[in-house]
A protein has these predicted regions:
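Asparagine-centered strand-capping/turn motif at beta-strand->loop junctions
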Residues: 2-10
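Glycine- and charge-enriched low-complexity intrinsically disordered segments
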Residues: 45-95
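Intrinsically disordered, low-complexity Pro/Gly/Ser/Thr-rich segments with frequent PxxP/GP/PP motifs
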Residues: 19-41
Length: 95
């Protein structure tokens, strides 16, 4: 399955912000997660936008902006599914 690997190569936590629902996952320095579209999504295409301390990810079916993929999973480097809000640091906002 087509997935988007995301790695935090910085020295501070990084927020992975998954649209369209705004699900957030926090990567500590050195962490690597992968965004996986739901089963059966044909030709998933990823769009990534970087803003301060945040990566915003959209997934589209076949690259069509009218076909937003809403069923996605985020896994760690061991393949373990991560819950929304994973590693959310105290006092940090994704905005």
């Amino acid at each position: 399955m087509n997935g988007l690997p995301v790695r935090n190569g910085g020295d501070d936590v990084l927020c992975l912000f998954l649209e369209p629902y705004g699900d957030v996952f926090w990567l500590k320095p050195g962490d690597e997660f992968t965004v996986l579209p739901g089963e059966g999504v044909p030709d998933p295409q990823f769009t990534v936008e970087m803003v301060k301390h945040r990566l915003i990810v959209w997934v589209f079916e076949g690259g069509d902006p009218a076909k937003v993929v809403v069923d996605c999973t985020v896994v760690d480097s061991g393949g373990n599914e991560l819950p929304e809000g994973h590693q959310w640091p105290d006092g940090r906002s994704p905005y």
